[in-house]
Amino acid sequence: MNKKVISISNLLRKRILLIYCLFVSAAFLLICSKSSPLYPMNDWVDVHCFLTLGNGILHGKVPYVDLYEQKGPVLYFIYAIVALFNQKSFWGQYLLEVITFGLFLYYSAKIAQLYLGKSLYVYPIVAVLAGVIGTTKAFAHGGSVEQMCLFLFAYGLYCVLRACHEERSLTFRETLINGIFAGMAFWIKYTMTGFYLGMALFVLVWYLGWLRDWKKLLKTIGYFLLGFCAVTTVVFLYFLINGAVKELFTCYFYNNIFLYPSTDETPLLELVQLRFKAAMDYNEMFPTLIYLGVAYLLVQAKEKPRDLIAFFLCFAGLVIGTYVGQGYVYYGLVLSAFSVFGLVGLATLLRLIRLPEIPQLAKLGVRIIRISLIVTVCLWTLADAYDKSDNTYLMNYDKQDMPQYQFAQRINQVENPTILNFGFLDGGFYYASGTVPNCPFFCTFNVDAPGMWETQYQYIEDGKVDFVITRHYPLEMYHLNHSKYELVQSASMPFEGIDFTYFLYQLKE
């Protein structure tokens, strides 16, 4: 029994940094993310699109065939698991965010340790990093794909930097996992694979320029592709079994590339530059940390030139991949994966401050003071996050105040109700009412998908759903025959700084 207790104690001691990062993640997301149990619900339309798809899979729906959406299938497989724990609350979503953000903080801390060693500075770095990212504009409502995938990039950076510092090639395990992560990124949101293109270019330069070992390079490429293909095989098998490979390529690739509305004739590279600059200007703190990180790596370039090259290539790849398509505010969050280098630079400056020699007994007091200061920094950062987060206003509302739950009370008076979220992205009404869409275009998307409007119009004109929900514009303002429906309820709620009115229409008896 004692041996088992000692073994558990040793395991906890070894994993103290990971446990700390998960704790910090849970604490900051409790405040900064609307998926937190402190909020009535996460009312972000993107999150609800993912949840509706995940819940649809649990009910036998096939993405892109039975339910249309724009992101990649791996995201929906993940959200099918989330939906199992998300039936009555957002605990499943919150847990997903805590784990993925906690892993990001952990691998960011491991990057910091490459430069600072086992320094106590790593602990406040984690807290400050969580506070900076959690309160940035790009964090949005919490629960974005970009937020969920931050740990993929942090792990990739950690692997290549650690291998460089140890003067060795990437191990089989490191390469395979990065290949799996690249496959996940590709089948979640393929623009994020720009990071891995940058990493691949760095590995090529590193193996041929420094290691001078093309055999290891070929092995590394093979292991990486093995991981990537493992994820891709699972995706293909699922859609092959369901006879939906064509729909997968049409919806996920063709529609996203060619059907997004654009009237901008600016050259593509200039457009990427403009979007990147806008993201760095709009978000305040993490771009500053990135600039500081670049300055730090430039100072270190003589001793660690590969670190700067790895940073630049991975960062450039991610920027180009992210902004070659669109430039929504939350897209910039992926760049915060590089923020830790700025905090490492600041910690390095602080370590240059030398205290005078003090007696051994006094050293214990100094250590206690340092730990107290670290705890103070962590608590102050948490309090500051509450003050700066754009989301905390929603804590003042109860579930009953939300239009989603108000409408759900009426919707659930009908046996096996069907609803259509019309004219805007998924507002959370499927989630609140516990319904699964019967219309493939269960909401109105930003991409002008073929048949989207026609299908939704047909469902309304033919009375194929029990309820229709619109936002801002009543059904009467659309050019369609809505005579089979009557307005039964309306409710208002602020969303992203705008007071929206929602309208609930019910099929006439």
What are these regions (language model features)?
Residues 138-148:
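Short acidic/glycine- and proline-prone juxtamembrane loop motifs at membrane-interface regions
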Residues 108-133, 150, 167, 173, ...:
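Transmembrane-helix signature of polytopic, membrane-embedded enzymes
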Residues 194, 318-320, 324-362:
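Hydrophobic/aromatic-rich transmembrane helices and adjacent perimembrane loops
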Residues 95-117, 155, 159:
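Transmembrane-helix motifs of polytopic, lipid-linked glycan transferases
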Residues 106, 281-318:
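Hydrophobic, aromatic-rich transmembrane alpha-helices
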Residues 387-388, 393-448, 456-477, 495-497:
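Short periplasmic/luminal acceptor-recognition loop of GT-C membrane glycosyltransferases, typified by
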Residues 148-167, 174-177, 182, 203, ...:
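Specific aromatic-rich, kink-prone transmembrane helix
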Residues 172-192, 196-202, 230, 315-323:
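Membrane-interface alpha helices of multi-pass inner-membrane proteins
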